[in-house]
Design a protein with these regions (language model features):
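Cell wall/extracellular polymer interaction/catalysis modules
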Residues: 1-107
Length: 107
């Protein structure tokens, strides 16, 4: 399955083998333009992620948790001094096991 997001249109599309399964509107962070760099910047991540959490009935309805940060996001954060080597390794392990990466980092 593939999930595509168009931030400018605020639209999500889910596809399987090229066939559209779902198309629906989405909500984004308070500052959706530009790449996400750190915790609290209000930006929506851009890149390739997997769904690591499905919340059926949250405050705003159903939500999908993305596997942010990715190893690439974490490597940039490590290079910029935002996270330490332990956090970088934790993100890499989470991605290797296809589980939720740590969300409590400075990213």
């Amino acid at each position: 399955m593939e999930v595509l997001i168009w931030k400018a249109r605020r639209m999500l599309e889910s596809r399987q083998e090229g066939r559209v399964l779902l198309r629906c509107p989405i909500a984004l962070g308070r500052e959706p333009v530009g790449p996400k760099e750190r915790e609290g910047d209000g930006r929506t991540p851009e890149g390739t992620y997997y769904i690591c959490l499905i919340k059926e009935a949250g405050k705003y309805g159903k939500s999908l948790g993305l596997s942010y940060p990715s190893p690439e996001d974490a490597a940039r954060g490590f290079a910029a001094g935002r996270i330490d080597e332990g956090a970088l390794d934790a993100v890499r392990r989470a991605w290797a096991n296809r589980v939720r990466p740590p969300w409590g980092t400075a990213l």
